A protein has these predicted regions:
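ATP-dependent small-molecule kinase phosphotransfer cores
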Residues: 1-56, 62-66
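Conserved phosphate-donor/acceptor-positioning beta-strand/loop module used by diverse small-molecule
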Residues: 56-61, 70-94, 125-128
Length: 164
């Protein structure tokens, strides 16, 4: 866990051995190894919440999204874009919990993930937290149908990000 994270709050922390056993037992709806750590979403947890009529927001990486997408799972997909690669680097550095090699790996992986952004139904630029939160709310509340393919400004922004 990172500083400030507690078990059962941000994540459920388990040993790598336990995780791999659960992965091999089809315990996870999606899973991925990201920056040397394993992450996954429990099928039972998701199913129980959906059975209770609760909509979920899964904060997952591209690997997990693609696994869920391959299952034809009914969902809205939203890719959160950084305002620039430089600001993303600043945000990672400001956490103060990564060495330079880890920061470089995160940036390399982020650039790779950006190439998959157009597989998502919605794109949000996280330049201002308040504005990004409002955009997210509009999508969730179905107030903003966003056809990203016809949004030339958004496509130009994504092309600019990918050019770094």
């Amino acid at each position: 866990p990172r500083k400030g994270e507690t078990n059962s709050a941000q994540y459920f922390f388990i040993s790598e051995e336990d995780f791999l056993h659960k992965k091999n037992s089809n315990f996870f709806l999606e899973y991925a190894e990201v920056h040397g750590n394993w992450y996954g979403t429990s099928v039972d947890f998701v199913q129980s919440k959906l059975n209770d009529g609760i909509n979920l927001i899964l904060e997952i990486d591209v690997q997990g999204f693609r696994q869920i997408n391959d299952l034809s799972f009914s969902c809205e997909s939203i890719f959160i874009l950084p305002p620039s690669i430089y600001s993303l680097e600043d945000r990672i550095k400001s956490r103060g919990d990564e060495d330079i090699e880890a920061i470089d790996l995160r940036l390399k992986n982020a650039k790779e993930e950006l190439t998959f952004a157009n597989e998502y139904e919605h794109l949000i630029i996280n330049d201002s937290f308040d504005v990004a939160a409002q955009e997210l709310y509009k999508i969730i509340a179905k107030e903003k149908p966003l056809n990203k393919e016809n949004n030339e400004e958004l496509q130009q922004f994504l092309a600019q990000l990918l050019s770094y």
